[in-house]
Amino acid sequence: MRCFALVMSLVAGATAASAQSFSVPVVYRKLPNGLRVVVSENHAAPVVVVEVMYRIGFRIEPRNRTGFAHLFEHLMFQGSEHVAKFEHVRIVNENGGVLNGSTRFDHTNYFEVMPSNALELAIWLEADRMRSLKITPENLKNQQDVVSEEVRVNVLNQPYGAFEWLGLPQKANTNWYNAHNFYGDLSDLQAATLDDVKQFFETYYAPNNAVLVVTGDATVDEVMKLAEKNFGSIPQRQLPARPD
């Protein structure tokens, strides 16, 4: 019994030490314009991850705007006021980084993994497209076609490929937001006007509808100064009620 108690105490101590060694420091802040900032410092390597998450995904799209969340995942790489078309990708790659974006049920996210000495560059790139995305007739038409083709190839033309996105939600739910076609009705997508798309951007791509997350080799003070400098002047907007 004494041996068993000793073993159990050692296991408990090891477990506690292990849990302590894996604790992750996280700091939450918010700018006056509503942008939430989450920072987790880890100085093990000179690398940072910068991510901006917007509260708009497949499930939150309003009626007659299905497919818009996914459309914007593509439009966000078409240039902004100070960054030409496709330059966002080139700039990140030439500074030793990688990037991507994705659309989920309740959010769309964009991220860069960069050397930590390029932290300000990554934050500036994200702020520039939140502030001044280039929504032009050419960019819209091009990405309408790209997204439509992606849906056809990856979903509609795949055996059972449509089930998760087009079939299951309607069978599992009655609320329209949870039951509609999550990849979007292609007729909604192709009917989108420039004004429709601009209004969607102005509604959902707002600082008070977003979270800036920075993890890695950066301090909280450094991140907050850069967040205020680059995002602080972007005005917050009136947000629609969130669906059930």
Where are these regions (language model features)?
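Bacterial N-terminal signal peptides
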Residues: F4-A14
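Boundary at the C-terminal end of the N-terminal hydrophobic targeting segment
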Residues: A16-S21
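Envelope-exposed proteins and targeting segments
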Residues: P25-V27, N33-L35, P46-V52, D106-T108, ...
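Short, surface-exposed beta-strand/loop micro-motifs that present aromatic residues
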Residues: V26-Y28, R36-E41, K198-T203
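Active/ligand-binding-proximal structured segments within catalytic/core domains
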Residues: G34, H43-V92
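Acidic/histidine-enriched segments that form metal/cofactor-coordinating
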Residues: Y54, S80-E81, E87-F200, K229, ...
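Short beta-strands and strand-coil junctions in structured, solvent-facing domains, enriched
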Residues: G57-P62, S132, V220-D221
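An aromatic/glycine/proline-enriched structural segment found at the starts
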Residues: T174, P207, V211-D244
